[in-house]
Design a protein with these regions (language model features):
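Conserved N-terminal segment of class I S-adenosyl-L-methionine
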Residues: 1-100
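A conserved beta-strand element that flanks and buttresses the S-adenosyl-L-methionine
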Residues: 106
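Short catalytic micro-motifs in class I SAM-dependent methyltransferases
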Residues: 109-110
Length: 240
């Protein structure tokens, strides 16, 4: 099964962003903080000195746990109290104010929930400044991720999806429907990506986390973890 091209979760699981945000912002869990640092600290050099930074699909807004001093505009399809602007990733109607004015777009584990990721990339380029950045964290459809998704019936994947077609790759009936293979399909072949998106250049594409996430205690849900101190988290990170 884990070598199959597709897997469809039996139901769509919508996390409780209110309770998850409260838990994350108040958390002193070193495992979780270490994970969030891995996801966001690398972005700091790209946003340093930048004026307009917009995160798409912010969800519980956990980026502010790590990068709080910087004015990052949080957007989401749902207007939670901590969200600055309601934005649908498939439309990105930011208005004339932001045309060619955005220094940095941030997408953290939300692109695979977008039914038309190619269209999203296209629309971002309309607002992005020359030499601007799109910073992305996304799942990699590895053997172990597939195993976890099947065991937990957590999310779906499809390596058959035509992500460059500018057409919906799944029914966007809920913002939590997903295809965790999206980033792999978009970015694994640099030449193919460049052909479809000549306005972009992939500067860096690398794997980042595995066991650090599995033992974090959870971002969009809370789960069992073994508490570790910074020393052992750094050791674990070496093997990641």
């Amino acid at each position: 099964m884990f070598f199959f091209k597709e897997y469809k979760a039996k139901k769509v699981k919508a996390p409780d962003n209110f309770s998850n945000r409260e838990r994350i912002m108040a958390s002193k869990n070193k495992n979780l903080i270490f994970l969030l640092n891995k996801r966001f600290s690398w972005m700091k050099k790209y946003i340093k000195g930048k004026k307009t930074i917009i995160e798409l699909g912010s969800g519980n807004g956990c980026i502010k746990k790590i990068i709080d001093g910087k004015k990052i505009i949080l957007t989401d399809i749902t207007k939670y109290p901590w969200i600055d602007k309601k934005v649908d990733m498939m439309k990105i109607n930011l208005g004339k104010k932001y045309l060619k004015k955005v220094d940095v777009f941030i997408i953290n584990h939300s692109l695979h929930h977008c039914a038309n990721p190619a269209l999203t990339l296209e629309k971002m380029s309309i607002y992005l400044k020359k030499n601007g950045y799109v910073l992305i964290n996304e799942p990699e459809t590895s053997f172990f991720l597939k195993l976890i998704q099947v065991l937990l019936d957590d999310e779906s994947w499809s390596l058959k999806a035509k992500v460059f077609s500018r057409k919906n790759i799944f029914n966007p009936k809920s913002p939590w429907v997903s295809n965790t293979a999206v980033a792999q399909l978009l970015f694994k072949d640099n030449k193919k990506f460049q052909k479809h998106f000549p306005q972009y250049k992939i500067e860096k594409n690398k794997l980042s986390e595995f066991t650090v996430f599995l033992n974090s205690g959870g971002v969009n849900s809370s789960f069992f973890h073994i508490k570790l101190n910074w020393f052992f988290l750094k050791i674990l990170n070496i093997f990641d």
